[in-house]
UniProtKB/Swiss-Prot annotation:
Protein name per the record: DENN domain-containing protein 4B
Its biological purpose: Guanine nucleotide exchange factor (GEF) which may activate RAB10. Promotes the exchange of GDP to GTP, converting inactive GDP-bound Rab proteins into their active GTP-bound form.
Disulfide bonds: none
Bias (Pro residues): 34-44, 1074-1083
Gene3D superfamilies: 2.100.10.50, 3.40.50.11500, Tetratricopeptide repeat domain
Record gene name: Dennd4b
Keywords: Golgi apparatus, Guanine-nucleotide releasing factor, Phosphoprotein, Repeat
MF-aspect GO terms: guanyl-nucleotide exchange factor activity
Listed Polar residues bias regions: 933-942
Boundaries of every cDENN domain copy: 390-526
Species assigned in the record: Mus musculus
Stretches of the chain forming a coiled coil according to its record: none
């Protein structure tokens, strides 16, 4: 898959200003004055001097000075009034431009502090008297004014003090808007009111014309479909308009002003812009006479006479637009372009640098975390990948917010935003407005501001301040030189750190906030506020290349950390504020109606309000009725694009504790630091044109100002432009949005895995939860592939129920979310409600993502149209019918009892008559049970007789099994007779398979149920004629096959051996796919049920099962009892007995084993030990060897056996009858095979069922890495993310992604979960040529997933011939039991049959320690002794299972006995020696893994 083109950093470059190529500017283009109350005209000159005169000493106001005689409210003002000896000081000031203006004032208390750096103390009057403002006396400190002046050469546009005033708080006067009040009282004495000095900083200028900015140039010229250039961009580039100004001729150009802005689309998406404003010369010829007079270029007295010594300048802006808020990089780039335009000459045009930056500078990504851009040898900028966080990316600067407002004012603004007040933020620094406004809307996360939001409002849009809705607007402070703010607006001055509100409005009080969260927030912000002065605040555009490469992260990393800490403090407050809100969400549980999306129907407002503190009810009452809270509840109920961020907030809510007065030790906003060896991509400047030999490189481009952009000078991109990607997570397949986990869910799952790894039981359940998560990731593909999708959804619902019963530890809610999403897609709202009820029953509170999918399924799906009344009536009728049937049941029971009594009477009479006749040739009469009695399963040794009642081996078999029943051989034969009697006549069906000594043969049973009461071991009754003929037919066929097989043996032995087949009807049928025989018509319906019904309805099986022989259950072909119960999941999806070819032989068989060899110690590590050794890391493939503690990658071995013939022929189809003259004709009924013998026969060149001839089996072997469920889930999610969920149902999956495929198949088969994977194996294998399909349909060529059998083995598939053979294999060799693979190597003489029997005898007598000691003695001490690849525990366990059958060995009891034996041996030999000789048992974690994943595998 080709790598996607990285997203661009910059999308557009624009130039804004006054349009027109030398043409006069129309006067109607003037910007209209905004509506609102007007102020007096602002002064044209700043204040350059301030003085204090003493009226009592006869001093007069100096010439050119203005005296402050009244307060701001118009009250008479006199300092130190009424005091004896007072000088009656008066403050005066002077305006002008002959010197730099004053920029700051202060009050100095002499003797208590020192003057600030850069300030001058005004200690004398212009007449050389003391300028002390305080009254005379020893108790009053001498008070002086001090000031700071702007630097020399600051220019015309330097900020300075433009106005002064005095306020009297005792008269109710407050600080005027946009003024800064000095905190020191000018009248500190006991007499007289307190007086405070206020001053205003601004830009004093006159002779200015303001016009609306227009677009002068742009690149690229064409709009991109995903991101067209907004038309209002020029207005935002020059928010105060495109001005024409008249300056003195020798005035220097001011420093360019950097500003930022945000454009919000209709869908809420943001576009970030950065502009650089500068001045350039403007021709006088373009001005009309009226415009020239307004600028002061012409005399107002003498009409038409131009004034000299004047220069005309206009303001222009260059800007970039991006989807990324990389403001420092934009500032550096725009500053470079401006310097490039005012310097020169250059060899490259300006357009080359613009196009190079747009096309070749990408936004940082995980593959490119650092990008160093060199624009020139002296201009560099560094782009770093933003901190990975679930919080939305924005241009907010919480440090700027805290620096300019302080902790208390920041909290007050938080309260104003939460209650949706009108906020007007203003400053003289336009680059500060966007950062602070973005922080204001980000501090209320997860709430999203829904009202008008303009961080930098242009002058032409200032009418929004009169809007009757809440808003957050940022504007330049010069707006208030002409207009007063509206009365209902809260004004925030970032330059003076003040909040201004009209007196008639009740001021905001932080006391309405929750007490403890407020105190903690205030304390945290105060602590961080004190650390801000030590951080780096220098301009990044001036940073050198050495600084960017070495010290940038060290210096700026501290600032980033503080930024996250401030954001985390606000986030914790919001989490405490909304703690427990999910408990008051109201899920939809019925068909939607009008008003279903109302907040009152989605959220219990009153209940949530009552759960809060009474002192905060006022705040919550306002908050719950805001637009942003309503939108928040709707997003939580129905999902949105912010679902990942909302889910992260839910995790924060779970972490915080509002009652605590200290923050949690774990920060809510975690920083993911990049590694020190991260990759840095270096981007060089654009290449200069080559210089021809013999010629000099002469610069060609020189500019007097910023030039007009020329399209022919732009460089074309090197690669084809594509759609501009939108910032955010990469796309995923549209068909599978629900399976995708958020980053927060991945973090939680990782922490949960690390925690579970320390607890054995939790680790096993954690792995199990990830396995179920894998299946639900594949569920969409499975649902699309099955005929009945509704049944598949119900199957998934039953899987959820099974997960709850097994107490699975789910790391996330993906399982529920996927099913709810599918319910919504396929219109199953009722099932979605049931899934939600299951979640609540399991104690899981759905997060925002899951809750959204649930409500979508309920709201958007079509509900059943039928009324519930009809269903209720049908239910009542059903109950009536069932009730009547229950009343009739005693009559049936009485009639059956009477019939049984009559039969018993008749049987007793027959027995009495036969005893009288004295006949000894007839067989004993057995009691005939009712045909409806449930069958029970019983197994005997075929080569050896049943164990004696005192046999110690019976103690290991499971309790309740008939294999350990104490009885005589006639009793067993009587039980066989009873079962045959219940079934009726079994027709002869071809030649049987040869019976070896020590093996079992099976007969096929089709009945399941018998009447309660009879006993299979009863005696004293006679066989019926049909059952006797059937039994004789079986014995006869066994004697007629002497030409093809060995002699069967004694009738008693043959009858005992046949018991295995009588007790395995369902397993034989499922393996052999042989059609059932026709049953007599007089059998009851229960006896006519198909053998496959026992697989589909395991609840009807008897509760106790008999033990099986080693010939069957000890082999690798047996289906475990737990595998039968797993098929109950298929009841809701499909019935095997209804599928075509359900009784066909398997076309493909797959053998899988996870047993892996540790090459460090040459030991085999088994499945549960591999699981226990996995690390809780989704990127670690290694496991830990339990013997040597070495790490290695386990392998999953796979062997496929393809039985499909390449060319079926009549000769091959008859090959099954050529070996025996009594074999049935082709196409007739095949032999009666046990599943063991059937599977073993598949290794032979022919089958005796008449369906397949001499077809060779294609065997393929392979081994792939065995992945932990954590690793596999990560890989599967990546695959689905990149290629969509459809890839999981494609036949190319096994070849394209073999590791993922075979691991999925292993886990799904291990947990007995339905999937499409077996069918993909069949579809991916090479079948016969198409020409052969015309010869007729063959069941072997049908791509039916049911014709694929998957066997999971415990041991290795192919044994190592150089190693010592396992004991269970030797047992089968000595017992002459056919095996799948013949042992290829030599067998040591010490491993004899007597040794094996001795080990089994010790195990049966509960003397496991003697068995272990015997093996250790036989093997000898290392390194000279025999080396077993399997541990002692594994050898004894497998040997016991081979002798008794794996379903009849209680492994839990065996583990207890082995543990006791190990402890007993450890007291004499030592634990360390036993571990060296690998005699220890598996760890508790491994045992729990085996127990949690179900029954043990086959071996």
């Amino acid at each position: 898959m080709a790598e996607e083109r990285p997203p661009r950093l910059v999308d557009y470059f624009v130039v804004a200003g006054l349009a027109g190529n030398g043409a006069p500017i129309p006067e109607e283009k003037w910007v209209p004055e905004p509506t609102g109350p007007l102020r007096p005209p602002r002064p044209a000159e700043p204040i350059t001097d301030v003085a204090v005169i003493a009226r009592a000493l006869g001093e007069e106001v100096p010439q050119g000075y203005t005296c402050i005689q009244t307060s701001a409210g118009g009250h008479p003002l006199e300092l130190s009034a009424g005091l004896l000896g007072g000088t009656q000081p008066v403050i005066c000031y002077r305006r002008g431009r002959d010197k730099p203006p004053l920029v700051e004032l202060g009050v100095l208390y002499e003797g208590k502090e020192r003057p600030k750096l850069g300030f001058q103390v005004l200690d004398t009057t212009p007449y050389s008297h003391s300028a002390n403002l305080a009254p005379p006396g020893p108790g009053h400190p001498r008070t002086y004014l001090m000031y700071r002046r702007a630097a020399e050469g600051a220019g015309l546009h330097a900020l300075g003090i433009t106005d002064l005033c005095l306020v009297l708080p005792s008269k109710g006067e407050g600080t005027p808007h946009t003024y800064c009040r000095l905190p020191r009282n000018l009248n500190p004495g006991m007499w007289g009111p307190a007086v405070y000095l206020c001053y205003k900083v601004g830009l004093a200028k006159a002779n200015t014309l303001v016009y609306e900015a227009e677009l002068l140039g742009r690149y690229p010229e064409e709009d991109n479909e995903a991101f067209p250039l907004p038309e209002s961009v020029p207005v935002f580039c020059l928010p105060m308009g495109a001005t024409i100004e008249c300056w003195p001729a020798q005035t220097k150009y001011p420093v360019p002003v950097f500003s930022t802005f945000v454009l919000t689309g209709a869908a809420g998406d943001k576009v970030y812009g950065a502009a650089l404003q500068f001045y350039e010369a403007f021709p006088r010829a373009r001005l009309s006479e009226r415009q020239a007079r307004a600028l002061g270029l012409m005399s107002a007295v003498e009409r038409g006479r131009a004034l000299g010594g004047r220069a005309v300048r206009s303001r222009r802006a260059i800007a970039v637009l991006s989807r990324w808020p990389a403001f420092p990089a934009f500032r550096a780039f725009l500053t470079f372009l401006y310097r490039y335009s005012v310097s020169g000459p250059h060899r490259l045009p300006l357009e080359a640098h613009i196009s190079h930056f747009i096309h070749n500078v990408p936004f940082p990504s995980p593959q490119r975390p650092r990008i160093l851009v060199q624009m020139s040898p002296y201009d560099n900028l560094l782009l770093c990948q933003p901190v990975s966080s679930p919080l939305p990316l924005s241009g907010a600067s919480f440090l700027q917010l805290l620096q300019n407002l302080g902790p208390e004012l920041a909290i007050t603004l938080l309260l104003a935003v939460l209650t949706e007040h009108k906020l007007l933020v203003h400053s003289l620094r336009p680059d500060l407005l966007t950062s602070v406004c973005e922080a204001l809307v980000s501090m209320i996360f997860p709430l999203h501001w829904q009202c008008p939001y303009i961080p930098l409002c242009p002058l032409v849009l200032a009418d929004v301040l009169s809007a009757p809705v809440p808003f957050i607007v940022g504007i330049h402070s010069s707006y208030f030189d002409l207009h007063d703010p509206p009365a209902d607006v809260i004004c925030v001055d970032l330059d003076t750190n003040t909040l201004f509100q009209k007196e008639e409005k009740k001021p905001l009080s932080a006391r309405t906030l929750p007490r403890r969260p407020y105190k903690l927030l205030l304390a945290t912000l105060t602590s961080l506020y004190q650390q801000l002065d030590q951080t780096y605040t220098g301009p990044e555009e001036e940073a050198s290349l050495e600084f960017l490469l070495t010290d940038y992260e060290a210096v700026c990393g501290r600032r980033t950390r503080l930024e996250r800490e401030v954001q985390g403090a606000f986030l914790r407050f919001m989490a405490c504020l909304l703690k427990g809100y999910r408990n008051f969400l109201r899920p939809l549980t019925q068909a939607p109606s009008e008003g279903s999306r109302d907040v009152d129907n989605l959220f219990y407002l009153q209940g949530f309000l009552k759960s809060r503190e009474r002192s905060s009810h006022k705040l919550y009452s306002q908050l719950l009725h805001t637009q942003m809270f309503s939108q928040f509840i709707e997003e939580c109920s129905f999902g949105s694009a912010r679902h990942a961020a909302l889910e992260f907030f839910d995790s924060c809510v779970d972490k915080v504790h509002p009652e605590q007065e200290k923050p949690e030790p774990t920060p809510l906003v975690e920083l993911e630091e990049l590694s020190g060896s991260e990759l840095t991509v270096f981007i060089t400047p654009p290449e200069e044109p080559p210089v021809l030999e013999g010629s000099e490189s002469t610069p060609q481009y020189c500019y007097d100002g910023f030039p007009e952009l020329k399209a022919e000078l732009f460089e074309s991109p090197q690669e084809q432009q594509g759609a501009l990607p939108v910032p955010g997570p990469s796309r995923s397949a549209p068909s599978s949005p629900a399976p995708r986990r958020t980053k927060q869910e991945m973090k939680v799952a990782q922490r949960m895995a690390q925690k579970s790894a320390t607890v054995p039981e939790l680790w096993a359940r954690c792995l199990l939860g990830h396995c179920y998560g894998l299946w639900f990731l594949c569920l969409p593909a499975y649902v699309r592939s099955v005929p009945s999708r509704v049944r598949a959804l119900h199957t998934a619902y039953h899987v959820l129920r099974e997960m709850e019963n097994r107490k699975v530890v789910l790391p996330d809610e993906v399982c529920y979310r996927v099913l709810m999403q599918l319910c919504s897609h396929y219109g199953q709202p009722v099932l979605s409600v049931r899934v939600m009820l299951e979640m609540r029953r399991a104690g899981i509170v759905p997060n925002t993502i899951t809750y959204g999918y649930y409500n979508k399924a309920v709201l958007e799906s079509k509900w059943p149209s039928g009324t519930p009344g009809g269903r209720l009536r049908w239910a009542k009728l059903r109950n009536v019918v069932l009730g009547a049937a229950q009343f009739r049941q005693p009559l049936k029971d009485r009639r059956q009892q009477q019939q049984q009594q009559q039969q018993q009477q008749q049987q007793k009479q027959q027995v009495a008559e036969q005893q009288k006749s004295g006949s000894s040739q007839t067989e004993p009469y057995l009691e005939r049970p009712s045909p409806t009695r449930p069958l029970q399963r019983q197994t005997t040794w075929a080569g050896r007789s049943l164990r004696e009642p005192s046999s110690p081996m019976g103690r290991l078999v499971k309790s309740g099994s008939l294999g350990s029943a104490r009885g005589t051989q006639p009793t067993v034969e009587a039980g066989v007779a009873h079962m045959i009697e219940a079934l009726g006549v079994l027709e002869p069906r071809g030649s049987p398979v040869p019976w070896q000594d020590g093996s079992l043969s099976d007969l096929s049973l089709t009945g399941e149920e018998m009447a309660p009461g009879g006993s299979p071991g009863g005696s004293g009754s006679a066989l019926s004629a049909q059952s006797t003929e059937a039994l004789e037919g079986i014995s006869g066929r066994g004697s007629k096959t002497s030409g093809c097989q060995e002699e069967v043996g004694t009738p008693r032995k043959g009858l005992g051996a046949r018991l295995q087949q009588l007790l395995t009807p369902s397993r034989r049928a499922s393996a052999s796919r042989i059609p059932p025989p026709e049953l007599p018509s007089d059998l009851p319906p229960a006896a006519r049920r198909s053998p496959m019904d026992s697989l589909l309805w395991p609840r009807e099986r008897p509760g106790s099962t008999a033990s099986e022989s080693s010939a069957s259950l000890g082999s690798e072909w047996d289906i475990s009892e737990s595998s039968l119960s797993s098929l109950s999941l298929r009841r809701s999806s499909e019935r095997l007995s209804d599928t075509p070819g359900a009784f066909q032989p398997p076309s493909l068989e797959i053998l899988m084993s996870s047993c892996s060899l540790c090459h460090a110690c040459d030991s085999l590590v088994y499945d549960e030990e591999i699981m226990a050794g996995w690390a809780p890391d989704d990127s670690n493939l290694n496991t830990t060897c339990p013997f040597c503690a070495c790490h290695f990658v386990p392998l999953l071995s796979v062997q496929t056996l393809d039985s499909r013939p390449s060319a079926p022929s009549p000769k091959s189809s008859l090959a099954g009858a050529s070996g025996c003259k009594d074999a049935p004709a082709p196409g007739g009924p095949g032999p009666v095979l046990s599943d063991r013998r059937f599977c073993l026969a598949l290794d032979q060149p022919q089958l005796c069922n008449g369906h397949m001839g001499s077809a060779s089996r294609r065997v393929e072997n392979g081994a792939w890495a065995y992945l932990s469920p954590l690793v596999l889930r990560k890989e599967l999610e990546s695959l689905v993310e990149n290629e969509g969920s459809e890839v999981l149902a494609l036949p190319e999956l096994p070849a394209a992604h073999p590791i993922i495929f075979w691991n999925l198949l292993w886990y799904f088969q291990r947990l007995r979960l339905p999937s499409v994977l077996p069918g993909l194996v069949l579809a991916s294998c090479n079948g016969p040529p198409p020409s052969q399909l015309s010869q007729g349909p063959s069941p072997w060529l049908t791509p039916d997933p049911a014709s694929v059998h998957v066997h999971l083995l415990w041991d290795v598939l192919t044994p190592d011939p150089n190693s010592c053979p396992p004991l269970y294999v030797l047992w089968r060799v000595h017992s002459q039991i056919p095996q799948r693979v013949v042992w290829p190597g030599p067998v040591p003489s010490c491993l004899s049959l007597a040794l094996l029997e001795s080990v089994l005898r010790h195990v049966g007598l509960n003397e496991v320690h003697k068995a272990v000691g015997l093996l250790l003695e036989t093997l000898g001490p290392p390194p000279t002794g025999l080396h077993l690849q399997r541990g002692i525990y594994r050898e004894i366990l497998f040997l016991t299972m081979a002798a008794l059958g794996k379903d009849h060995v209680d492994i839990v009891a065996f583990d207890k006995k082995y543990k006791s034996a190990f402890n007993k041996l450890a007291s004499s030999m030592g634990k360390e020696e036993l571990r060296q000789r690998r005699a220890q048992m598996p760890t508790p974690k491994a045992i729990d893994c085996r127990k949690c994943f179900g029954a043990p595998l086959e071996c």
